[in-house]
Swiss-Prot record:
Species name: Gloeobacter kilaueensis (strain ATCC BAA-2537 / CCAP 1431/1 / ULC 316 / JS1)
Subunit structure: Homohexamerizes, interacts with McdA:DNA, interacts with shell components of the carboxysome.
A cellular component annotation (GO) from this entry: carboxysome
Range of residues in the leader sequence: none
Function: McdA and McdB together mediate carboxysome (Cb) spacing, size, ultrastructure and probably inheritance in the cell, together they prevent Cb aggregation in the cell. McdA is an ATPase that forms dynamic gradients on the nucleoid in response to adapter protein McdB, which associates with carboxysomes. The interplay between McdA gradients on the nucleoid and McdB-bound carboxysomes result in the equal spacing of Cbs along the cell length. Stimulates the ATPase activity of McdA, causing McdA to be released from DNA.
Keywords: Bacterial microcompartment, Carbon dioxide fixation, Carboxysome
Protein name stated in the entry: Maintenance of carboxysome distribution protein B
Bias type Polar residues, positions: 140-150
Gene this protein is translated from: mcdB
Region (Disordered): 1-38, 101-150
Amino acid sequence: MARKRLTDLLREGQDPAEAEAEAEPSPAPASRTGRSPLTALKASLAEAERRVADLQGQLQERDAAHRAEVERLHTELEKVQKEALQLALANTALIEEVNGLRQSPPAKEPNAKFQPPQKQPLLPTYKVVPRPIQRAGEPRNNNDIPSWLL
């Protein structure tokens, strides 16, 4: 009893009902039509081959769809890369132009730019108010003579 067989060890981990089911191999099921086990095996083999062919067809269809998607994405990537290159070249040209304009003094063109008028200091303006002509010693009216001085 010290030595157990491998099948005994395997059966210990299983239910007793399952162990009995495995111990008794069942004969190949005969179909109801009275076919022999050989014809049943041939039929199941044909069914399996048909199923394999269907799955291979589905695999080929999916592979073709994936390849088409990869090709579309590849062309889109190339297009985006070309556009990015064009934008980078245009950006470089604009940067060079801006740097060139910063380094060179602006050329003065007459009538090209608006020149604001120069500021001049504001001088006070005097307005001359006309006065009636009067002789020096004569009062104009009696009302003009100050009465408080008399």
